[in-house]
From Swiss-Prot:
Signal peptide (residue range): none
Catalytic activities: a 1,2-diacyl-sn-glycero-3-phosphocholine + H2O = a 1-acyl-sn-glycero-3-phosphocholine + a fatty acid + H(+)
Protein name: Phospholipase A2 2
GO molecular function: calcium ion binding; phospholipase A2 activity; toxin activity
Listed GO biological process terms: arachidonate secretion; lipid catabolic process; phospholipid metabolic process
Amino acid sequence: NLYQFGNMIKCTIPKRLSWRSFVDYGCYCGKGGSGTPV
């Protein structure tokens, strides 16, 4: 859900990055940075 997605983002990227930076960055989700790119 949206709450879990928000927590996932917080755990995955540095706080200095904005939402726009996150979208451009294309982060990998999951422990150790592994998983499916978003």
